[in-house]
Design a protein with these regions (language model features):
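Ligand-binding pockets and gating/stacking loops
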Residues: 1-475
Length: 475
């Protein structure tokens, strides 16, 4: 079909005007028209079918969440150079940062060590220590693998891009892990897109880049008063009128199919229009929380103002995932950098934010488990970097890329374990250090994907892009 073909000229106009499809439908359905995607089958037997990706924007302090450091209390108020651990500042990573830490190494020796701002308790049969700010996640410790040795090379908030894509913010953009999953695997649902973003975005507003916009996440904003306004038929069009227009458009497409019998795009287009129509029923249904019991709603914190917003997002994630959405990413922390970026007021900031996410996150894990979904759903809880062991100002911590924590649970992940460690001050990942793409590699492995087989002509991937499976945490 040529550019002059009238059936190819205005697909978007037809969808939006003639058929009345909103913005939500457009991105998700156009993947059906892409010709060069893989066949959608896993490369080997998968252990998981879907991913729920929870990302805390701004930088969660590892020593106030999942990596206790009692030495911070022991040496509180002293400079790093006054402790037995002053050698942490000699590491080559500090000298090789592309975006340097604020101040030089000598300046950091003068920064006073900031004590932990909360306590830790042991949870579950595993006895893993978890912050008092995350007691509900603590109650799920035996289902979680805590990775305490993550590192990245960006010490600014562009690290949000790096954690999702594996590439530095200053490098040319490449697809994110969600886009690769969307590109590499076939659909589990005839009615929904395969990659959805709920809530605010990270620094990059796109996911797929050279894979094409068909593989970007479909952005979904949950509004209890009007949950899916932009996916309703436009211009006052009724569902019956939209169906008639759809049938007319499909007749035109089938006429074009007779004129161009060897063109596979036309049949894909017919299917994609049908998908967009079905989405207008399927998505609102997935977001209809009235179908859930009051007990389930309380499990996610929908009965509390502090947890309601994040709880709604996670409940939506569960409902979308059980309906076949492959990859759901949820960002927590508004603002340009992300609300977890507590350069000052860390105790007040982190304790408030943790109350927003702790109960709903634990509720998600417990709900997935009791429904039998956790065994084939990967849940990731991540952030772009940690925070410094030293103070910034009187009561905050600065960005820290050399060592921090994330956790994974669910499909194929061992529960009740920790992997890797940082040094006594939480400064460097010293045991089993993992670059951010090791998380990607682990997800790909569990989803049955060999990323080396997803190469796109003209876009050579680096070895660092693939990462290494964190073997110690998978079955």
């Amino acid at each position: 079909m040529t550019r002059d073909d009238p059936f190819a000229m205005s697909r978007r106009a037809v969808l939006q005007s003639t058929l009345g499809f909103g913005a939500l439908a457009l991105n998700g359905i156009m993947a059906a028209e892409t010709l060069n995607r893989p066949d959608g089958r896993p490369h080997f037997m998968p252990k998981a079918k879907r991913v729920i990706w929870l990302f805390m924007r701004g930088g969660v302090s590892h020593m106030e969440s999942f990596d206790p450091k009692p030495a911070l209390n022991e040496f509180a108020g002293k400079s790093i150079s006054e402790t037995p651990y002053k050698s942490v500042l000699d590491a080559s990573k500090i000298r090789k940062l592309r975006v340097p830490i604020k101040g030089d190494a000598n300046g950091h020796t003068r920064i006073k060590i900031f004590p932990m701002q909360t306590g830790f308790k042991r949870y579950g049969q595993s006895g893993i220590e978890i912050s008092d700010w995350f007691p509900n996640i603590g109650s799920c410790a035996d289902d979680i693998a805590f990775i305490r040795s993550m590192w990245t090379s960006d010490n600014n908030h562009g690290a949000q891009v790096q954690f999702h894509s594996g590439r530095h913010f200053l490098d040319p953009r490449v697809p994110t892990i969600g886009a690769w999953i969307n590109y590499g695997l076939g659909s589990l649902s005839e009615n929904l897109p395969q990659f959805i973003n709920i809530g605010p975005r990270f620094f990059d507003k796109k996911d797929a880049h050279y894979l094409g916009p068909a593989y970007d996440a479909v952005n979904l904003k949950i509004d209890p008063k009007n949950p899916l306004d932009y996916a309703k038929p436009s211009n006052g069009m009724t569902a019956a009128e939209q169906r008639r227009n759809l049938e007319l458009t499909n007749k035109l497409n089938r006429f074009a199919a007779k004129q161009y019998p060897l063109d596979p795009v036309i049949e894909a287009r017919i299917k994609s229009y049908e998908l967009a129509f079905r989405m207008q029923t399927a998505v609102p249904d997935a977001l209809d929380f009235s179908q859930e019991s009051s007990e389930t709603q309380k499990l996610y914190g929908l009965d509390r103002n502090e947890t309601k917003s994040f709880g709604q997002q996670l409940l939506a994630a569960r409902r979308l995932s059980e309906r076949g959405v492959r990859f759901i990413q949820i960002m927590h922390g508004d603002g340009a950098a992300g609300a977890w970026d507590n350069h000052s007021g860390l105790k007040n900031g982190h304790s408030r934010l943790s109350r927003q996410v702790d109960l709903p996150t634990a509720g998600l894990l417990k709900d997935l488990k009791r429904r039998g979904l956790l065994e084939d759903t990967i849940v990731v809880f991540a952030t772009e970097f940690g925070r410094t062991p030293g103070s910034q100002g009187a009561d905050g911590r600065d960005h820290h890329s050399f060592g921090f924590s994330v956790w994974m649970a669910g499909g194929g992940i061992k529960g009740g374990i920790t992997n890797g460690s940082t040094d006594e001050l939480g400064y460097h990942a010293v045991e089993a250090p993992h670059y951010v793409t090791d998380v990607h590699a682990t997800i790909n492995h569990l989803m049955g994907i060999d990323p080396h087989k997803l190469e796109v002509p003209g876009h050579k991937r680096l070895e660092m892009d693939f990462g290494h499976v964190i073997e110690e945490i998978v079955f």
